[in-house]
């Protein structure tokens, strides 16, 4: 005798909801909220880097330079670059023998 014939399989009635008041509006609302929460949680986990980067830095890439003369813009760029160069010099190279 095969093992497959001795395994009990659930009947169609076994999968049905046993709640007598499943048509209650509160149960339906809770189910919808639960499904929406699950969908939002999955989207959050998939795109959390993009979402929180937008919140942290906003849509702009930097301060607005509208109405600022070109010479001041160039000076600002040089200051930013020198600040980056200083940060690069902060690291120490250690050589092991």
Swiss-Prot record:
Topological type in the membrane: Single-pass type III membrane protein
Which residue ranges run through the membrane?
23-43
Molecular function terms in GO for this entry?
A: monoatomic ion channel activity; proton transmembrane transporter activity
Phosphoserine occurs at 64, 82
Cellular localisation: Virion membrane; Host apical cell membrane
An annotated GO BP: symbiont genome entry into host cell via pore formation in plasma membrane
Q: Where is this site: Seems to be involved in pH gating?
A: 41
Return the annotated site residues (Essential for channel activity, possibly by being protonated during channel activation, and by forming the channel gate and the selective filter): 37
Activity regulation statement: The M2 protein from most influenza A strains is inhibited by amantadine and rimantadine, resulting in viral uncoating incapacity. Emergence of amantadine-resistant variants is usually rapid.
What's the chief localization of this chain?
A: virion
Pfam (any one): Flu_M2
Q: Which residues lie on this side of the membrane: Virion surface?
A: 1-22
The UniProt family comment states: Belongs to the influenza viruses matrix protein M2 family.
Task: Describe its partners and assembly state.
Answer: Homotetramer; composed of two disulfide-linked dimers held together by non-covalent interactions. May interact with matrix protein 1.
Supply the name of the protein: Matrix protein 2
